[in-house]
Each structure stands twice: as structure tokens, then as C-alpha cells.
Amino acid sequence: MAPSIQSLSMIHDSQECIKPIPAFSCCYLLRSCVRHASLYIGSTPDPARRLAQHNGDRYGAAKRTLRENLRPWEMVAIVSGFTSRVAALQFEWAWQNTKVSRHADLDGNATQELGVRICPRTAKEVKRVAKPRTSLTNILANLHLLLRSPYFSKWPIEVRFFSADVHRVWQVWLQRVDGLLNDGIRVVTDFAPDGISEVEGKELLAGAGRVGTLDVGYNSIKEYVEKSQFLLEDGERINCGVCKQRLILQHDIIAVCSHSSCHCAAHLSCLSSHFLKDKDSDSELVPREGTCPTCYSKLEWLTMMKEISLRLRGQAEVNRLFGRRQRAGTPKGQGLKSVRGRGHSEDENESDALQVSTGLDTVNLPPCSDGPWTIDCAIGVLGGIAHRPGGVSSGNDSDATVTPEIETHPQRCRRNQNTRTQRLGLQKSAMINLSDWYDAEVIE
């Protein structure tokens, strides 16, 4: 049966306050490269950027990581798969305060034995008194405890290790503990390549290492989002792949198969019931994965929910994903044929709005019919003129170069260099209005 949803107006009306499922959000474990006993737990949507902040390369480090005698820090493990930043913060707090968390079962042998520590280098037990809060073994034991809890065990969590010795401690602890992790929780390793020298290792650490290769955007589902838009905006009649009833695009919440060759679409409630029925589990209310009713391929529920949230309340994120940005100051008429940008802004919100270049722009005019001539000028944001020999701009890599190709007319070209220079001196904007160039004058 189709869902009894009357309208999606409430979802669309709440787009300003409800954001889509974030592309990436994780909790991380830091370890000081100088003193391995110094550890730090935090959460972030961008691990590489956050690691640079902790190491002092960018502004915004935590108070506990400001000490220069403990820098640099390395990110040894992350826990990802959270559907919101609130969920990541919730797991972060539980990981930092496992003893007082209601999700941790402290009965029996759930916690680490006092006075027992596992050496990361030799993977052997060291029976000496250690601080439980700063012990790597204790932190990994608390992580294992939370992942086995009834609350977090049903989340689509992935644990990724970047350090081999930390992963060795994790494996030793798995052999000691009685409980097992849920099959839905993935544990992967992402170590640095073998054969790296000490100098190369320091450079790799300064550049965030393997952490910098993580996909923290929606690029992994870009083709999926494009396919769903094309399928649902086609206007043809689409029937639910489960209940076979017609889908009402304006009223139903529709889930689309993530495989590129399949055109299956279904009601969200129908597909959820189909997934739970195949798993034959009465304890779960939200599925984690399932098979498509048409192509019988494996589908991840979190991936489908990301696409639905982007489609219903993430139009701004979709526009940034496909580069649909209107260039400020671009004339509607013909003339401006090529716009070339160089470099990228380091601002975190650079994709939220089109930034005005803070450098110099180089403008090149094509030759007039009377003879070859070129005016090279650099127009700054404040309207100043800086002539460069040969038309070479002295701006840095973040400068944007705008090169308009303008068709000139002989009857409108006047040979007066002084007048032309004065006209350029009155320019107050970095953007070029084509109507100002119709009266261009030839400089001989």
C-alpha cells in the first residue's frame, strides 16, 4: 500500500531550518607524535582541516592541543557514518565519558582491568598502574564497548585506523573481550604505504597523510543525485517497485535505486518494509541495507537517505555539487566569451557564495581593424590602475583572470591616448561592462 502522506509542503517549508544529511561527520582520536601517552578525542566534518587546526597550521585549535611541546599531532583513528552532527557529538561525549554514559554497560568484564595496559609496539600486556583516561588501551576498550551497546550497534558506523600500532592494540583487545561487534559495523585500515623514509613521513604527516584523501563531500553520490533528478523530472508515469501503485511526485516521498542501470523507484515506507521483511527481523524499525526489488542489487539505506534529503531540502548543496552558480557581473549580451579562474580560496564557506577577487584582473583587448594594438591594465578592487609591461599580472595564485573578447568597430576607435587613460582611471569595479568598451579609443 502507498503511504498516507498528503503533502510534502511541511518538508519544503522547513528547508531553512532543517539541513540535509551531512556528507561526512566523524569522531577522531589524536595522538601526540612527541608523547604517545597524550591522546585527544573530538568530532569534525572535515578531518584534514581539523588536524591542521590542532597542529597550528590553521586557526581554531583546541585548548588541550595548543601546547607546542606536544605538537605535531597525528590522527590515528576515526569513527564515521553518523547521520547528523548531533549524532557525532553524542558519540563523542559518550566516548570521552564512557563511565557515566547511559549507553555503556559497566557490569561484568565490560571495562578494562585496572593496572593492565597493552603496549602498542609489542602488543603485550604491561601490568603496571596506568591512568585509565589517557591509556590508549582504555580508549579503544571504551570504543569497543560503545559499539556493542544496543543503541550504537544499530548505527551504520565505520571505524578506520590510520596507524598500524593502534590497530594492533585493537586486535589484541578483540581477543581479550568476550563480546563481538555487530556485522553491520565495518572496521577498515588505511595505513601509509611501506618504504616511506623519516623525512617523507614528516611531510606526509604535515599534509594530513591518509586523512587528506577522505571524501568529505557529496562527490560519491553525484551521479546518483543526477540520475534521480532525471528520472523524477521526466514527467512519465512511474509505479512503485513494491506496491505497484502510481507514484505522485508532488506528495510521496520517493526512494530511487542507487545503481545507474536500474530505474526502480518506490515509496519510502514500502521500500523500508521490503528491506525489513527480507531481513526477517522484528526488533529493527529502520533498515540498514537491503536488495532492490527490480535489479536485486544491494542498497545501503544511508546512501539512499542522503539522496532523498538532498532532493527535498538540500537545493543549495545540489547547486554547489554541480557548479550551478551565477557569476556576479556577467553581462547578458555577447562579448564576454571566456572567464578563467586561478587558484582556490581557503575560506571554509567558499562554496556558499561567489567571492569577489581580491587581486588584480588583466584585461586584453583584441586588435582593431586599423592595426594591431593592445592595452594591458590591471584593475584592482578599489579602482586603481597598475600598468604591467607585457600584460603580466603580479597577483598571487588566488587571483582571478578575466579575459573578455570584444568585437570592436573602426568607426568607434579614436586615437587619443590621454583620453583613454583617463577613462580607465575612472573605473571603480573589477567587473567589465561591455557598453563602456564600445567607445574604445586606439592607442598608437
Swiss-Prot record:
It is an enzyme of class 3 (hydrolase). It is found in: Nucleus. Pfam families: GIY-YIG, SLX1_C. Residues 324-354 are annotated as: Disordered. CDD domains: GIY-YIG_SLX1. A zinc finger (SLX1-type) spans 240-295. Keywords: DNA damage, DNA recombination, DNA repair, Endonuclease, Hydrolase, Metal-binding, Nuclease, Nucleus, Zinc, Zinc-finger. GO terms for molecular function: 5'-flap endonuclease activity; crossover junction DNA endonuclease activity; zinc ion binding. Its cofactor is a divalent metal cation. InterPro entries: GIY-YIG_endonuc, GIY-YIG_endonuc_sf, Slx1, SLX1_C, SLX1_endonuclease, Znf_RING/FYVE/PHD. Its EC number is 3.1.-.-. Residues 23-105 form the GIY-YIG domain. GO terms for cellular component: Slx1-Slx4 complex. GO terms for biological process: double-strand break repair via homologous recombination. It comes from the Eukaryota. Belongs to the SLX1 family. Forms a heterodimer with SLX4. Catalytic subunit of the SLX1-SLX4 structure-specific endonuclease that resolves DNA secondary structures generated during DNA repair and recombination. Has endonuclease activity towards branched DNA substrates, introducing single-strand cuts in duplex DNA close to junctions with ss-DNA. This is Structure-specific endonuclease subunit SLX1. It comes from Paracoccidioides lutzii (strain ATCC MYA-826 / Pb01) (Paracoccidioides brasiliensis).
